Amino acid sequence: VEWTDFERATIKDIFSKIEYDVVGPATLARCLVVYPWTQRYFGKFGNLYNAAGIAENAMVSKHGITILHGLDRAVKNMDDIKNTYAELSVLHSEKLHVDPDNFKLLADCLTIVVAXRFGNGFTGEVQAAFQKFMAVVVSSLGKQYH
């Protein structure tokens, strides 16, 4: 993947400003509410029966934060995201049996949450860079499925 200077700077800027303990839980909670079939991967998380239960679930919050810290690895290794996520791809495909389409759903939810946090600063150009980055992440996580 070729990254422009603007794209690199934009991705680094976004992730330097994201409050992981807010955005991570909000992103995963949104995914579990909007796409309820994704809940099947989180059976041990307890109350996922409604939006309030999901939003208040400590395990959802913790895993949402973990996801964002996982994205940090991609930000720090933008030139080698596929290899950076090789083990994580194996884990999700072979052990957890996660449908790879769910990575795209989660990426879309993250884009919405980030856009709401950044407001007018999330311009079309910023969104294009962010979505390109997330598309590379999603592709890398799905690498083991092919």
UniProtKB/Swiss-Prot annotation:
Protein name stated in the entry: Hemoglobin subunit beta-2
UniProt feature coiled coil, ranges: none
Annotated tissue distribution: Red blood cells.
Family: Belongs to the globin family.
Organism field: Dissostichus eleginoides
Binding-site residues, heme b: 63, 92
InterPro entries: Globin, Globin-like_sf, Globin/Proto, Hemoglobin_b, Hemoglobin_oxygen_transport
Keyword Ion transport assigned: no
Cellular component, GO annotation: blood microparticle; haptoglobin-hemoglobin complex; hemoglobin complex
